[in-house]
Amino acid sequence: METEIWKYIDELAKRIKRIIIVFIASLLAFLAIPSPSPFGIKGSSILFYDTLIFWIIRKMEEAYLPPDSKLIVISVTAPLFAILQMAFYLSLIIAIPVAFREIYAFVSPALYRREKAIIKKYLLPFSLLYLTGMIYTIIIVLPLTFRALIFLYYHLNIELFINLNDFINIVILMVILGGLLFALPTLVLPLIEAGILGTRTLSKNRIFIYLIIAFIASLISPDPTFLSVIPLLIPIYALYEATIYFGRIIEKKHSKVS
């Protein structure tokens, strides 16, 4: 018995080690990978080597902020922390799929064949919906969010200065949130298929769940008017209703089989 426990602990340690290695390798790679024009900013000197992280931050600034706004830092070390922060988030995005794969490989021997089939069935839809949510947030939600915020500042006649670290946090967290919220159906439908959750519960608590989703989105969004969050909530609520619809189909199939 004790030997079996240590065997599982050793297996778990190996899989955690793989996740950490992927994360650290991604972190170092993002800090070292050159931008599309690595010496195109201030000359050809190695002192002005331009990394992919710098390039991404500049593109974010160009996409979401007006030309007369300024990104500021409040300490000497803030730019360094901003670079590490961006590299950390990007590395996390790379490491998360690896973590899911390793977790599944660890627990799969204890799962029944039907449970394995359910998990495998929703892996691709989860990835596609998560990616769609991130792209939708980048293209639609974030521009509207910053436009609403800037509109408010201009009408109050306030000059716009945005903290670099806050800017990165807002963008990355909203992108991750958008991806996760879009992927919710692929997390709920397996629970319905496994008989753990029912569509009646989802229908009964619909308003409460809508309010929770809206509250979480408003916490991350910097827009105090809440208007820019609406384009994110509309497709998510539509996906929630679609989840209930397909969940009922699954329940009917199960009732016929039984």
Task: Give the role of each language-model region.
Residues 1-258:
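Membrane topogenic/interface segments and analogous intrinsically disordered interaction regions
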